[in-house]
Each structure stands twice: as C-alpha cells, then as structure tokens.
A protein has these predicted regions:
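A transmembrane helix-and-boundary motif of multi-pass membrane transporters/channels
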Residues: 1-182
Length: 182
C-alpha cells in the first residue's frame, strides 16, 4: 500500500531529529568550532600562522575524544596534543637533510604506530601523531619560528580540551542517553 506523504515527511523528520541529537553530530559541531574559530580569528587579526597552528592542534587532538570517562578523554586529548607538538617540532627541522629526514621519519613512524597496541584510544592518539608527522612536511612556518609553531599546536590541543570540557559540562549524560536509547 502507498503511504501518505505526511507519513513519509514525519518519518524523515524523526530521523533528522535523531541525527541532530546524536553524539556524532555534536562532536562534529565541536570539532567544527574548534578548528574554524582559530582560523577566523587568525585571519581577522592578521596572524594567520598562529590561527593555523591552533587549528592543527585542535584537529589533531580531536580523534582521541571518544566515549568513556572524562579523565580518559582528558589524558587522550593531552597526549595527542603533546605528540603532535613534538612531531611538528621535529618535522619542522627535518627539511634540511634528506638522509636524516628519511631515517627520522622511519623511526618516528614505527614508534608512533607502535602506540596503537595499547588499545583503541591509544590507536587514535597514534593516528593523530602519524597525521601530524605527515602534515608537518606540508607547511613551512614563515612568519613565526618552528618552536613557536609547535607550541601553538600544543595550545590548540589545550583549546580543544577546553571546548570538550565545556561541552561535557553542558551535556554530561549525552553519551549514556544515546547508548540506552539504541
């Protein structure tokens, strides 16, 4: 039998509302704010590289923000930020000697990938570190020093942690409610 068009519309609206209430959507909004706000403010105040470094730090810290206790989230986000900061610092100075860069990339790649044996959150921290390793060669800091760029990457991770903490205090039971509703 054919259903009425209003039945289809109400079903789609229910599905849309369920998507908008999901934790995946709220994390996407959180990452969108954490990544876009530093870029916008950096462009606005003519400090593009600082905004970009903060954006990178927030982006590379966000994968370890998965369901679990807030203590584990905090440790994962801070570990991702520290790893991205160290890798960004090392990667910033590896552009000078090719033979040195290849050996350091191999060593860092293995060491960072080895972190993933410690569990799912550790594999996401490892993913952040490997992503930071690859992308550290894509950008050359021109206006600020490499160590400053690395520090702003770490500050971007702290920025994401601050936003995640605020979001957690606004919706402390969001993940549990979604788990029980399924």
């Amino acid at each position: 039998m054919l259903k009425k068009p209003t039945t289809y519309i109400s079903e789609y609206l229910k599905e849309l509302l369920q998507i908008l209430k999901s934790t995946s959507f709220s994390r996407a909004v959180l990452v969108g704010i954490a990544v876009s706000l530093p870029i916008i403010l950096g462009i606005r105040f003519d400090q593009y590289e600082i905004g970009l470094a903060l954006c990178f730090g927030a982006f590379w810290s966000s994968p370890s923000d998965i369901s679990g206790s807030f203590r584990h989230k905090k440790i994962g986000i801070l570990t991702s930020a520290a790893l991205a900061m160290v890798v960004g610092f090392i990667g910033g100075y590896l552009h000078y000697e090719t033979w040195l860069a290849l050996s350091v990339i191999g060593f860092l790649g293995f060491g960072i990938a080895y972190l993933s044996i410690y569990g799912f959150r550790a594999s996401l921290v490892s993913f952040s570190g490997l992503l930071a390793l690859v992308l550290s060669f894509a950008h050359d800091a021109e206006e600020i020093a490499i160590y400053q760029f690395a520090l702003f990457i770490g500050l971007g991770g702290v920025w994401y942690l601050l936003l995640a903490k605020i979001w957690y205090h606004i919706h402390p039971t969001e993940e549990t409610e979604e788990l029980f509703s399924e």
